[in-house]
């Protein structure tokens, strides 16, 4: 079944997150959050399952991509888009059905996906957009670790000068990811930098990372956490850097367990290297994570 799901995901331009749901309430919640879900329905599902000769398609359950949408009257509905192979063979169109209509044929199992966000290279003109994303993310991601006074005083243009300079001179590259027309995440990356984050001090074995690429920073608007956008950003720059460098590294705050789990899930491993830096009189520790080819 995973092979079939992968095939369908490719056809619809989405990627899977390997999250399984077990009931209609979970499915509805994921649809409301913008995911595409591939659900298993019974062979007697009455919307689009009947062949021209009157018989039903398939001998067992059928996998159906499910999108969230609304009817003209504003009532929540499921938008069903069948596998492309069915178009040619059975001339099956699309249907929008209500939860009540969908529920009797829903097997109770689905896997959620998300439409791929739009990525583009960032330029110096995007400095304010990037800075705004970073500032909003910092205020949520680092609350409780970075001093409140620093976070509360963080303005949306805090990083504008930095990004204007680095993106103009080419010392860093950057990418933005969009949800429709809205920039919701950004990543800065490039060759390994000689300086440490925030002018910090290295503790640990160190080592020669001059042949590595570096993900200098990656942040999302808080409402876009855990929706696949960060993964798409990271995988894009990681793969780009691996085309030139022996590996990729990044620094992550020791106490930021959400971020650490995210990087570990995508193949980065922690090292014994730490960077000690000071923000408003508080010493913070970043851990170096490395991804090898």
Q: Where do the model's predicted regions map?
A:
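Active-site-adjacent substructure of cysteine-protease-like catalytic cores
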Residues: 20-81
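Short, high-confidence coil segments that cap the C-terminus of an alpha-helix
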Residues: 34-35, 172, 245
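Acetyl-CoA-dependent GNAT
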Residues: 121-127, 131-144, 149-223, 234-236, ...
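Conserved glycine-rich acetyl-CoA-binding loop
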Residues: 217-235, 254-261, 265-266
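Cysteine-nucleophile protease catalytic domains, especially the papain-like/related folds used
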Residues: 1-21, 33, 111
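Short, solvent-exposed loop/turn segments that connect beta-strands within catalytic domains
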Residues: 71-77, 180-182, 280-282
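C-terminal "cap" of GNAT-fold acetyltransferases
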Residues: 175, 209-213, 246-260, 264-293
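Noncatalytic regulatory segments and standalone regulatory/sensor domains
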Residues: 57-58, 67-117
């Amino acid at each position: 079944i995973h092979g079939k799901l992968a095939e369908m995901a490719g056809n619809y331009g989405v990627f899977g997150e390997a999250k399984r749901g077990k009931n209609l309430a979970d499915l509805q919640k994921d649809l409301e959050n913008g995911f595409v879900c591939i659900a298993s329905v019974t062979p007697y599902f009455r919307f689009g399952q009947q062949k021209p000769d009157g018989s039903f398609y398939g001998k067992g359950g059928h996998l159906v991509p499910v999108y969230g949408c609304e009817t003209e009257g504003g009532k929540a509905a499921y938008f069903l888009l069948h596998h492309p192979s069915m178009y040619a063979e059975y001339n099956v169109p699309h249907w929008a059905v209500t939860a009540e209509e969908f529920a009797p044929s829903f097997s109770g199992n689905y896997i959620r996906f998300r439409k791929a966000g739009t990525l583009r290279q960032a330029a110096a003109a995007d400095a304010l957009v990037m800075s705004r994303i970073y500032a909003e993310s910092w205020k949520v991601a680092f609350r409780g670790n970075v001093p409140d006074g620093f976070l509360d005083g963080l303005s949306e243009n805090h990083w504008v000068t930095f990004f204007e300079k680095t993106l103009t001179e080419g010392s860093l590259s950057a990418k933005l990811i969009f949800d429709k027309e809205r920039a919701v995440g950004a990543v800065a990356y490039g060759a390994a930098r000689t300086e440490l984050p925030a002018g910090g001090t290295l503790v640990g074995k160190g080592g020669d990372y001059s042949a590595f690429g570096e993900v200098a920073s990656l942040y999302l608007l808080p409402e876009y956490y855990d929706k696949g956008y960060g993964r798409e950003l990271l995988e894009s720059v990681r793969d780009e850097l691996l085309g030139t460098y022996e590996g990729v590294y990044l620094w992550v705050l020791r106490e930021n367990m959400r971020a650490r789990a995210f990087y570990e899930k995508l193949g980065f491993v922690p090292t014994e290297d730490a960077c000690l830096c000071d923000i408003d009189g508080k010493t913070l520790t970043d851990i170096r994570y490395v991804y090898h080819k």
